[in-house]
């Protein structure tokens, strides 16, 4: 059974049904299905954890307290067969409240203003700068305000008032939890949450790999933890050092903290053996298995690599007391980005033309 409270409860029910004595009944659990880990688990059995069993029973009671009261109401108001639960009912309310806030929001008008600037010195190139304001950042709320600024600066000579150069650091994303895996698989692979979990289950339970037999390729995929075992972290760091060199190998291992309230019962989702590279076993996987395994493998490896470095330049140009700003960043050192770049629902920054 799964290494969680539901799996613990199933084990307890089996023990009770079979009439097995507590003192001679043991449970073996593991988070990855590999020969080494399974043998270690068999060598270290434990008794059934009644705290986990009680937690499952409490969850079951709460499901019924909520579901038995709300489900009949749904049948009356909407249609029969609908169900309600302790999680989905609250989540539905939060979604509805948010939708009400969106509908009641009074939209405000915002304008942006860009200036295409070119240095007087020829053959240097053009770049785009965004309107900033005068002494402090100013928002433009109407076409009239935009036209007023344009009438003032159009055709005027801009003077560079400030240039700032700095090195920026970008750190890798943490390893996957269940929710972040579903989000990233949707963004990058176009897979639904349900399909993501189905394919992850296949990778966890095991795939026939040429020369290896049936191998569980990833750890347990239902987790809210960012924790990694010391053994897995050491294996990743050793792989990074051998494959990419010292520059990509940070001085010490990265440790990620779980969010407040996380159960932290299992490790983060990671490959069970980092040396099984996606492209080397691609022929043994389906297209979906390969894509999802590569996503998990890359994210795990990247989370233990050096930070990426950028050279950032911000230029401020002024005309008639109005300031415009342009920012551009060049990748100086790829770091973890040599392996993996986290997806975004929306671009964090607008693409800027290179600065001369």
Annotated model-derived regions:
Residues 1-356:
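Toprim catalytic domain recognition across nucleic-acid enzymes
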């Amino acid at each position: 059974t799964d290494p969680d409270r539901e799996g613990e409860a199933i084990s307890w029910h089996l023990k009770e049904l079979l009439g097995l004595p507590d003192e001679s009944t043991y449970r073996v659990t593991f988070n990855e299905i590999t020969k080494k880990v399974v043998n270690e688990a068999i060598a270290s059995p434990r008794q059934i954890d009644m705290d986990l069993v009680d937690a499952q029973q409490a969850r079951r009671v709460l499901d019924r307290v909520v579901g038995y009261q709300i489900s009949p109401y749904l049948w009356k108001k909407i249609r029969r067969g609908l169900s309600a639960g302790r999680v989905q009912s609250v989540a539905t309310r939060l979604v509805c409240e948010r939708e009400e806030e969106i509908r009641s929001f009074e939209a405000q008008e915002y304008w942006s203003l860009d200036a295409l600037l070119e240095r007087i010195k020829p053959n240097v190139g053009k770049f785009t700068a965004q309107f900033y304001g005068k002494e402090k950042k100013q928002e433009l709320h109407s076409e009239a305000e935009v036209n007023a600024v344009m009438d003032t600066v159009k055709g005027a000579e801009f003077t560079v008032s400030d240039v700032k150069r700095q090195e920026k650091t970008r750190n890798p994303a943490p390893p996957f939890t269940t929710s972040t895996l579903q989000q990233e698989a949707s963004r990058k692979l176009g897979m639904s949450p349900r399909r993501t979990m189905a394919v992850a289950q296949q990778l966890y339970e095991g795939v026939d790999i040429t020369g290896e037999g049936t191998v569980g390729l990833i750890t347990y995929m239902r987790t809210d933890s960012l924790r990694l075992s010391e053994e897995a972290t050491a294996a990743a760091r050793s792989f990074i050092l051998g494959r990419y060199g010292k520059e990509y190998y940070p001085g010490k291992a990265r440790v990620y903290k779980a969010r407040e309230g996380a159960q932290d019962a299992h490790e983060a989702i990671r490959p069970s053996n980092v040396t099984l590279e996606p492209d080397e076993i691609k022929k043994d996987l389906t297209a979906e298995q390969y894509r999802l395994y590569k996503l998990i493998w890359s994210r795990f490896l990247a989370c233990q690599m050096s930070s990426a470095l950028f050279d950032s330049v911000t230029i401020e140009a002024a005309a008639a007391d109005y300031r415009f700003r342009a920012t551009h960043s060049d990748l100086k050192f790829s770091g973890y980005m040599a392996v993996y770049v986290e997806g975004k629902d929306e671009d964090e920054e607008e693409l800027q033309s290179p600065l001369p």
